């Protein structure tokens, strides 16, 4: 047993694949270093100074003032937009690759059954009429039937409603899945604009879910 204060690294012996053996276990250099640092910290020494290579950056928003973590990092401007497969109101797939060569605006939100989300779809429906060669896609976890009902009732004709109810990985690829909070499992409010070459040129993660996005920024 290695007691705190004893530098156990000197007892390690090189094993297969250039790993070090300590008792019945093998450690690579990074693991051995980590164990030594843990021993130093236990003895009241310095804090670990190596970054955690497996650390995942999580984006954070708020819901009525309370922090909400997203499962992953929100997509950044300048990167290639990941392809996705959503479901249209007729239950056929909608893929980003199907829209290649056109400008795409993704209006992402939690649910059509909230006033703010419904307002965003109405606003983008008006904007879409004046945006040349642009496809505006309304994305949420609502069922395709709910999307169809809303668009029929509200007279939405310039927006393509699309559902992520099949958990196809869209939320993970774009970093918009709420990992906790009252709306856990739904999509955070965001707007992503993709140019004709498939690059993200605008990415807006709305800080407060109960507030509307910046429409002007998305329309530029």
Residue ranges and their predicted role:
Residues 27, 33, 41-57:
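Short, Lys/Arg-enriched N-terminal segments with co-localized hydrophobic residues
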Residues 52-220:
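Chalcogenol-based redox active-site neighborhoods
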Residues 4, 9-14:
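Short linear motifs in low-complexity or flexible loops
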Residues 18-19, 28:
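Alpha-helix boundary/capping motif
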């Amino acid at each position: 047993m290695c007691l705190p204060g004893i530098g156990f690294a000197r007892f390690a012996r090189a094993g297969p694949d250039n790993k070090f053996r300590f008792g019945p276990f093998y450690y690579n250099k990074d693991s051995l270093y980590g164990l030594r640092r843990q021993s130093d910290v236990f003895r009241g020494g310095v804090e670990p100074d190596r970054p955690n290579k497996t650390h995942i950056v999580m984006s954070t928003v708020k819901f009525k003032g309370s922090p909400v973590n997203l499962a992953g990092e929100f997509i950044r401007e300048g990167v290639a937009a990941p392809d996705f497969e959503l479901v249209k109101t007729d239950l056929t797939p909608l893929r980003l690759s199907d829209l290649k060569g056109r400008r795409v605006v993704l209006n992402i939100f939690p649910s059509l059954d909230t006033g703010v989300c419904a307002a965003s779809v109405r606003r983008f429906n008006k904007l879409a009429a004046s945006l040349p060669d642009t496809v505006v896609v309304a994305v949420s976890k609502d069922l395709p039937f709910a999307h169809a009902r809303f668009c029929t009732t509200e007279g939405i004709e310039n927006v393509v409603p699309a559902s992520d109810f099949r958990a196809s990985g869209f939320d993970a690829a774009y970093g918009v899945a709420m990992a906790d909070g009252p709306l856990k499992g739904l999509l955070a409010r965001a707007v992503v604009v993709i140019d004709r070459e498939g690059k993200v040129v605008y990415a807006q993660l709305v800080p407060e879910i109960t507030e509307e996005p910046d429409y002007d920024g998305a329309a530029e």
